[in-house]
């Protein structure tokens, strides 16, 4: 049984009350101010029926109110489901219902879609902020093995799975990151990634654990981010490939304060890493996923040039193996990446079958392919064999194929990622049609059922799809 910790935000507010916690534009909160705002919001949420042990779903963009709401839920002892704002209403509703969320905390324009209270009562964050503020007693301690957050990630079967991330996962992720990247007194971490993704949300946990300032952007804009790095003296920023590419195109030389651009969301092409090297942009590659509560391997800064293209070595207290057919691979031999350690999720919510398939003697099978070099550095070859990573968003072909196959005129469907200069990869669909159907109709059909980034950017009509002897679709031959 893991030990308990004092309430993190309350403890941080007592230790460094006047240190800046969050900056978003002109809106700034110190840790003591953040604690007071979170406690007031906790009281308001309690008046809306939330209590210790409940689950709340958050459907919010990057805004100060979301930061406050996250901490308010933790003060109440409420676990959080982070909903992707890009999902369709049907996708969001499934996640709300499956997680048994009691309350949906959201904003315009989403509030109108969920007004009916199905499957949870929807409340506008502005209504919460304007509500009366009854007194509330925050929980004094947190149980490290309790689930703090739930994030849904689609599996290769196309069905969403709820990843349960414990307070221990978040704590050891933050500590392991600090042991790898170092922690400096004046560190400021810029986040322009969505807070509903683990790479964005993890910065909020690091903030209270480190006593570090988060500089929050509602969305990514290269010029605004570069201006913010200069004006706010940002030292670390989390990025994905598309963001890094746009930043590199805008600068000739690295801003003086910046010591780390933590790159996640899939491998970056060597050409981009070499461009960043020329411009002295301090790119630190990492490897991780929702199930590992952000990074589980990171390339230490001193190896960033020598091991260009590597995701580095496991973070402290974590382990990584490469396996093939149940046998550990030798250096240079390709196999499945398996991971173990205190940042690995508690499991998938209400999905024992997936848990059984994903874990073997405590090791989590990622489904990703990679290898170690002779020096023990990890190289990731593919983020799961068929996974499409588009602008940092995960797209699972099976999920898109299932929607296409639900169209009455589509007999067979296959989806794969095609290289794209802007997004890295975009989905293309390959179809066998029962009767005539045009691309515009299919696109509209998908838009009603999928997030916009999952909708195929092109539709190719073929006579048959490539399949193996077992009749399994061979997507790499599409």
Curated annotation (Swiss-Prot):
Please give the family membership noted in the entry.
Belongs to the ATP-dependent AMP-binding enzyme family. MenE subfamily.
Q: Which key words tag this protein in UniProt?
A: ATP-binding, Ligase, Menaquinone biosynthesis, Nucleotide-binding
Q: What's the catalysed reaction?
A: 2-succinylbenzoate + ATP + CoA = 2-succinylbenzoyl-CoA + AMP + diphosphate
Q: Which GO terms describe its biological process?
A: menaquinone biosynthetic process
Protein name per its UniProtKB record: 2-succinylbenzoate--CoA ligase
**Species of origin:** Bacillus licheniformis (strain ATCC 14580 / DSM 13 / JCM 2505 / CCUG 7422 / NBRC 12200 / NCIMB 9375 / NCTC 10341 / NRRL NRS-1264 / Gibson 46)
The Enzyme Commission number assigned here is 6.2.1.26
Lipoprotein as a keyword of this entry, yes or no, is no
Q: Could you tell me which pathway this protein works in?
A: Quinol/quinone metabolism; 1,4-dihydroxy-2-naphthoate biosynthesis; 1,4-dihydroxy-2-naphthoate from chorismate: step 5/7; Quinol/quinone metabolism; menaquinone biosynthesis
A molecular function (GO) held by this record is:
o-succinylbenzoate-CoA ligase activity
- What is known about what this protein does? Converts 2-succinylbenzoate (OSB) to 2-succinylbenzoyl-CoA (OSB-CoA).
């Amino acid at each position: 049984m893991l030990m308990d910790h004092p309430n993190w935000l309350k403890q941080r507010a007592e230790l460094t009350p006047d240190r800046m916690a969050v900056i978003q534009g002109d809106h700034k909160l110190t840790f003591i101010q953040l604690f007071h705002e979170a406690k007031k919001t906790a009281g308001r949420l309690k008046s809306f029926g939330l209590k210790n042990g409940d689950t709340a779903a958050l459907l919010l963009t990057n805004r100060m109110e979301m930061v406050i709401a996250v901490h308010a839920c933790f003060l109440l002892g409420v676990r959080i489901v982070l909903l992707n704002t890009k999902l369709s209403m049907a996708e969001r509703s499934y996640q709300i219902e499956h997680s048994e969320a009691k309350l949906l905390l959201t904003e315009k324009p989403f509030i109108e879609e969920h007004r009916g209270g199905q499957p949870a009562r929807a409340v506008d964050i502005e209504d919460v902020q304007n509500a009366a503020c009854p007194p509330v007693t925050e929980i004094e301690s947190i149980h490290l093995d309790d689930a703090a957050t739930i994030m849904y990630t689609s599996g290769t079967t196309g069905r969403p799975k709820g990843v349960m991330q414990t307070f221990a996962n978040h704590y050891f992720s933050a500590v392991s990151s600090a042991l790898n990247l170092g922690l400096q007194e004046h560190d400021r971490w810029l986040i322009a990634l969505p807070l509903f993704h683990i790479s964005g949300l993890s910065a909020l946990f690091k903030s209270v654990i480190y006593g570090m300032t988060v500089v929050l952007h509602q969305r990514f804009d290269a010029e605004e981010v570069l201006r913010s790095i200069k004006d706010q003296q940002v030292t670390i920023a989390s990025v994905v490939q598309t963001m890094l590419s746009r930043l590199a195109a805008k600068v000739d030389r690295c801003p003086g304060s910046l010591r780390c651009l933590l790159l996640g969301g899939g491998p970056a092409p060597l050409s981009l890493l070499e461009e960043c090297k020329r411009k002295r942009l301090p790119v630190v590659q990492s490897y991780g996923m929702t199930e590992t509560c952000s990074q589980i391997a990171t390339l230490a800064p001193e190896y960033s040039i020598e091991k260009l293209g590597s995701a580095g070595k496991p973070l402290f207290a974590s382990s990584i193996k490469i396996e093939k057919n149940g046998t550990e691979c030798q250096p240079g031999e390709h196999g499945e990446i398996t991971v173990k350690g205190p940042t690995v999720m508690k499991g998938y919510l209400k999905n024992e079958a997936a848990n059984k398939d994903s874990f073997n003697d405590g090791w989590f099978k990622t489904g990703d392919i990679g290898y170690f070099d002779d020096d023990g550095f990890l190289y990731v070859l593919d983020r799961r064999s068929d996974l499409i990573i588009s602008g940092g968003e995960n797209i699972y072909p099976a999920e898109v194929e299932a929607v296409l196959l639900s169209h009455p005129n589509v007999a067979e469907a296959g989806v794969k990622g095609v290289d794209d200069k802007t997004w890295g990869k975009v989905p293309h669909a390959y179809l066998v049609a029962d009767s005539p159907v045009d691309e515009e109709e299919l696109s509209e059909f998908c838009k009603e059922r999928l997030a916009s980034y999952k909708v195929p950017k092109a539709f190719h009509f073929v006579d048959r799809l490539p399949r193996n002897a077992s009749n399994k679709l061979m997507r790499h031959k599409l």
